[in-house]
Amino acid sequence: MEEQEGTLPQKADFSGWYNDILWRAEIMDVRYPVKGLYVWFPFGFGIRKRVYGILRELLDRDHEETLFPLLIPEPEFMKEAEHIKGFENEVYWVTHGGTTPLDIKLALRPTSETAIYPMYALWVRSHADLPIKVYQIVNTFRYETKHTRPLIRLREITSFKEAHTVHATWEDAERQVEDAIARYREFYDRLNIPVLISKRPDWDKFPGADYTIAVDTIMPDGRTLQIGTVHHLGDHFSKTFSIQYEDTKGQQQYCHQTCYGISERSIAALISMHGDDRGLMLPPEVAPVQIVIVPVIMKKREEEIMQAAELLEKELQNAGYRVKIDTRDLRPGAKYYYWEMRGVPLRLEIGPRDLDNGVVMGVLRSGGKESLPRADIIAEVNRKMTEFTAILQERAKTHIKDHLVMVKEESLVNEMVSKGVVAVHWCGNRECADRLEEIADASVLGTEVRTDLIDQTPGTCIICKKPESVVTLIGRSY
């Protein structure tokens, strides 16, 4: 790729920066000839593989991975009216097999409840069969009519992790919701992405759910991005699909269920939260290349320098690091540009003077050079990686703090929401919420906010002045 054609827009121009970095850093190619469908570059897919590796690790503690079909028969898909009402305008339908019209239309899954739950009705017989905890990572299809954007708003979601659990009681399902929230918080902690967790208002919950807990983060332009959801489904779907078990008294009972999902929006958040004007900045755990070694060649000592670089590479690889030596016939500056764009956490430079002094020059992607003793290189690299991770964490935390503000005057809501997420007191009345959304030109995101960044003490509703109103988040969203 000609990644050096022009320069990356400054991150202050977030839309331009985001669109450019996807191809300059070789994450996604947007030129596929169907709107809303994109192609993963190998480097971008390497990030995806490691991000979803963390997710698999967290879920595999007590979930089992599975795979259900992409195609859903229309009669099964249409069974749950409230659920389908939320998706019917977004469904792709398969109507022909070759040139032959199908007797029954088949939906390309927009989500998998109606594919999975008919099978659960066959699998569950007794209380001994419970709980069921499975997940799959699949592609889903939604006919988005809004403006599509890679990783954020797609017609093919290529990396949808959806978990579906079945329990004996509502309370068991509620405990599973809390477990899923904790799992997602741990996932985003490892990506160094601070999150805001809240309960969506009833009119914005998942179709067919008792309630929805959402995981949001704040993008560089102050808009929120929903990067995870957890839904308590109650016995709504089990009644529709006849998912029942025999309890210890021999009575038939309907099951209670949960589902929770994360998509490649997690990677959009990763890119956006940590990147800067020079490109990506990737946490070491998910960087396809963690360390790049750049030999600084002097012709008379080229062989000696290359041998030293190869020995260094092998030593670092044996310590568990993903390492590349850049041997391309390019100026050092061009190599630095290339690897900085791709967010490699640490660059090690080794030249004749470094050889003579028994050191390696270390440069973190966040900036700053340091001479590292060659004899202690593994310990030194470990230290630098820890330092880099701490820098990412602190920068991200500062960003969220700077874009989350408590507002107590109605007249200030619109001005402040243009800069980020606003916390207000809201009585829970839909009319007050509608008024809030009107004056803010934004959405009510949720209540029961789980963050220590704002005071959660109840107060007076910002609209109707009712006392003992709860803290609620307002924001403009992708």
Swiss-Prot record:
Its EC number is 6.1.1.15. Homodimer. Consists of three domains: the N-terminal catalytic domain, the anticodon-binding domain and the C-terminal extension. HAMAP family: Pro_tRNA_synth_type3 (MF_01571). Catalyzes the attachment of proline to tRNA(Pro) in a two-step reaction: proline is first activated by ATP to form Pro-AMP and then transferred to the acceptor end of tRNA(Pro). This is Proline--tRNA ligase. GO terms for cellular component: aminoacyl-tRNA synthetase multienzyme complex; cytoplasm. Gene3D superfamilies: Anticodon-binding domain, Bira Bifunctional Protein, Domain 2, C-terminal domain of ProRS. SMART domains: ProRS-C_1. One of its GO terms (biological process) is prolyl-tRNA aminoacylation. Keywords: Aminoacyl-tRNA synthetase, ATP-binding, Cytoplasm, Ligase, Nucleotide-binding, Protein biosynthesis. It comes from the Archaea. It comes from Methanospirillum hungatei JF-1 (strain ATCC 27890 / DSM 864 / NBRC 100397 / JF-1). It catalyses: tRNA(Pro) + L-proline + ATP = L-prolyl-tRNA(Pro) + AMP + diphosphate.
